[in-house]
UniProtKB/Swiss-Prot annotation:
Function: Catalyzes the ATP-dependent phosphorylation of N-acetyl-L-glutamate.
Protein name: Acetylglutamate kinase
Gene Ontology terms: biological process: arginine biosynthetic process via ornithine; L-arginine biosynthetic process
EC primary class: transferase
GO CC field: cytoplasm
Pathway the protein takes part in: Amino-acid biosynthesis; L-arginine biosynthesis; N(2)-acetyl-L-ornithine from L-glutamate: step 2/4
One Gene Ontology MF term: acetylglutamate kinase activity
Lineage: Bacteria, Pseudomonadati, Chlorobiota, Chlorobiia, Chlorobiales
Keyword tRNA processing: no
InterPro entries named among the record's database cross-references: AceGlu_kinase-like_sf, AcgluKinase_fam, ArgB, Asp/Glu/Uridylate_kinase, Glu/AcGlu_kinase, NAGK-C
Subcellular compartments: Cytoplasm
EC number annotated for this UniProt entry: 2.7.2.8
Reactions accelerated catalytically: N-acetyl-L-glutamate + ATP = N-acetyl-L-glutamyl 5-phosphate + ADP
Length: 303
């Protein structure tokens, strides 16, 4: 990572001339992405630390102010667990997904659609943005079907369809939709939906320019190095060699599935650093890993 990105990422004050250089570097990207749609999946430490929450809200507001349509999909697993504990309910997981019975789905709905969603909307508004809270239940935003392991997971759903007309309407009005990942089926049953899966489905349905995962992972590591870009062929080789392993494998495979669905690029960035979202989008080098269909040898770091 170049020294300037390191300074800005750390939260330290960078020299004015260096900040000016970043602004100049950002200009072609601002022009390029005006009118485009970015879907951002917001989760991890960036949702817990007050400084990081404010930084993220500032970043999202700026993206919208320069003409980018921002659609935000958030998680909230820790908040759900805390609320459940206060209500005397224990949280159980199966292969990383929350087992969701009738009692737990009420906790999920109350927590995600209530406190978590509205806190994000409030923060964005405090920084000058115009956000609107949305759940998958509103205007059929997310129609769901039972997941394949419903016998073990209960009311956990997969996305069946997305109401793109409603989301587009909000974006055209200059609003930032903040979407809680719950949905319902044709019988009216409500489902808890994995936020990563919901963000991927929304990005594909909207034919988004980018899907950006704000997480607790810096990107894809090869040894001590963070890959700036990775294409499908490289990923297959790294998985075969064991360089990409464990829980990172499904994330990588999901990213390329989303690319195959028509999304322009997928980005994986670390939300534990201030302004990582802007640095990833508006600098040549970026701060995370972008997933692309194939490598462009003429523009290897092009965001």
């Amino acid at each position: 990572m170049n020294p300037l990105c390191s300074e800005l990422k750390s939260g330290r004050n960078a020299p004015p001339a260096a900040i000016g250089q970043v602004l100049i570097e950002a200009l072609p990207y601002i022009r390029k992405f005006e009118g485009k749609t970015f879907v951002i999946k917001y989760g991890g430490s960036a949702m817990k630390d007050d400084k990081l929450k404010n930084s993220f809200a500032q970043n999202v507001t700026l993206l919208r102010k320069v003409g980018i349509n921002v659609v935000l999909v958030h998680g909230g697993g820790d908040a759900i667990t805390r609320t459940a504990e206060k209500m005397g309910l224990s949280s159980r997981f199966h292969h990383g997904k929350r087992v969701t019975d009738i009692e737990m789905i009420s906790v999920v709905q109350m927590t995600l659609a209530g406190k978590v969603n509205q806190d994000i909307v409030r923060l964005i508004s405090e920084h000058g943005g115009k956000a609107v809270g949305v759940t998958g239940l509103d205007a059929d935003t997310i129609k769901a079907i039972p997941c394949q392991n419903a016998d073990k997971l209960g009311l956990v759903g997969d996305v069946e369809s997305i109401n793109t007309l409603y989301i587009d309407l909000l974006c055209r009005a200059g609003l930032i939709p903040v979407i809680a990942p719950i949905g319902y089926d044709e019988d009216g049953s409500i489902y808890n939906i994995n936020a990563d899966d919901a963000a991927s489905s929304i990005a594909i349905a909207l034919k988004a320019e980018k899907l950006i995962y704000v997480s607790d992972v810096e990107g894809i590591h090869v040894g001590e190095r963070i890959l700036k870009t990775i294409c499908k062929a490289e990923a297959a080789d790294f998985i075969e060699q064991g360089i990409i392993s464990g829980g990172m494998i499904p994330k990588v495979l999901s990213a390329f599935k989303t690319l195959d669905g028509g999304v322009g690029k997928i980005h994986l960035i670390d939300g534990k650093f201030t302004h990582s979202l802007l640095l990833e989008i508006f600098t040549h080098e970026g701060v995370g890993t972008q997933f692309i269909a194939e490598q462009d040898n003429d523009n290897p770091g092009k965001r």
